[in-house]
Amino acid sequence: MTKRPGGDADSGRYDEYNDWKEPKEYMEWTANIFNHFDNILVENGVVLYNFSYSIENPSLPYELVAHIVNNTNFCIADTIIWKKKASMPYPASPNRLQRVCEFVFVFVRKNEIDSFTTNKQISKVGTTGQKYYVPVPNFIDAKNNDGATKEMNQATYSTDLVKQLLKTYAKPEESFVVFDPFMGTGTTANGCMEYGCSCIGTEISERQCEYANERIRNIFTTTE
């Protein structure tokens, strides 16, 4: 589970580096990341990849999804709509709409499209043995983020969003491990710990690592 780094804005959104890339370079870079996901993702696991379009390149998410599907072992299983509590209004634009929602794309291996794991519960079993499941909507209403960290990272999501996603795809068990390759300020880890599963994260920004570790220490202190 992760929120993809920028890549399509004129200015960097990380404290450590300028994350802007040309669209072709960005798509190739992302496909390479997904090929690495294929090496570490458990059987029938999922990749929850959050990103939205930008005013600079609104077509990029759709081009990126197509590039991933065409150049990796992954395909789209579902698209979750995340409705944020606040959004960019673009008051100076005569034609751009207010972006209230973002996407969370659910990627699975192509050969596991019929077997990937969720927490959908059986509602009944028919006389022929056919199982019927409680519906789970592809819509989440959640906070934007956990507070202002713009001086370090302008692209964060909320613990609220993380826990709602985990409720559908993860087990609240220590043995269930979530990996966030762009950990940032530690929101994925924070959500995992509150939900009850484990998390491994990587991050190149030393400052953000320190911030994330402090958040984790605070959770341990609170629960002791």
For every predicted segment, state its role.
Residues M1-Y211:
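Core catalytic lobe of class I
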Residues N213-E224:
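Short, conserved SAM-binding/catalytic segment
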